[in-house]
Amino acid sequence: MKPENKIPVLTRLSDEMKAVVNFQQPGLPPWPADGDIETQRQYYLLERRFWNADAPSMTTRTCAVPTPYGDVTTRLYSPQPTSQATLYYLHGGGFILGNLDTHDRIMRLLARYTGCTVIGIDYSLSPQARYPQAIEETVAVCSYFSQHADEYSLNVEKIGFAGDSAGAMLALASALWLRDKHIRCGNLIAILLWYGLYGLQDSVSRRLFGGAWDGLTREDLDMYEKAYLRNDEDRESPWYCLFNNDLTRDVPPCFIASAEFDPLIDDSRLLHQTLQAHQQPCEYKMYPGTLHAFLHYSRMMTIADDALQDGARFFMARMKTPR
């Protein structure tokens, strides 16, 4: 699609979102567009420090969990001594960027709002690790904590997955993997999904939205996909194109959140409509005036905090619902 035909989203953003877009961190160099992937990862970590400041204080513990691919680092956030459930969090970053530190504030707020232990999983990044390694690492982490719950003072009778962007895909894919492979790590009561991609190759929103402001042009999305997948055939895998999986049965309750001007919004809409059509429990909420990745900006955007609290409320409601 000719770029000039796209919707001029920057003129339609909320005032809060505009403030974030126009915010300049003092001393922050420009994005290293020509840098190698490691340079870009270090920049992303540096740029996110401001947005992760002033987060709630709580007990944390780092644990290296053995998986078939080697140890994976996890971080446990415990807002209180006892917990009614355990929530596993998968960070976004296009499969190639991000770690536990870039999403620290998000996980702390989720732990605070749910009152539950949140476990962040520092899965291996692409292109060094290809599909389905991150999913298999996530499943291995869940299995480990299910078997060692007492050692970490965890309640794994009820568990959930949560994630943003690529992490949302990994969260839902991991849940479907557990179901399809008949692996039990606890009663999976809910999945919290913020502006994920779920397998569409093209859509109206991908044509109308996306640009330098969000790093989600068609070329960007192709780059993330090529870094993550092993080959073209993986595009149709039911744990990558999740619409090729069976979404008509036994899908845990899903909270599906989207950003109004996100090129990936149609992925969320289609997921919601598919689950709804087959009576799978779900809730969809679109946050007006926002761009992809707005969840990071709760220091300046009340709507980002609202989106986290909405997901937390959904999770807490499922904790009280027999399943």
UniProtKB/Swiss-Prot annotation:
Subcellular compartments: Cytoplasm
Domain of life: Bacteria
Annotated coiled-coil segments of the chain: none
Chain positions of motif Involved in the stabilization of the negatively charged intermediate by the formation of the oxyanion hole: 91-93
A cellular-component GO term for this protein: cytoplasm
Major localization listed first in the record, in broad terms: cytoplasm
Database matches in PANTHER family: AB HYDROLASE SUPERFAMILY PROTEIN C4A8.06C, ALPHA_BETA HYDROLASE FOLD-3 DOMAIN-CONTAINING PROTEIN-RELATED
Subunit and interaction comment: Homodimer. Interacts with MalT and MelA.
Function: Displays esterase activity towards short chain fatty esters (acyl chain length of up to 8 carbons). Able to hydrolyze triacetylglycerol (triacetin) and tributyrylglycerol (tributyrin), but not trioleylglycerol (triolein) or cholesterol oleate. Negatively regulates MalT activity by antagonizing maltotriose binding. Inhibits MelA galactosidase activity.
Name this protein carries in UniProt: Acetyl esterase
Gene coding for it: aes
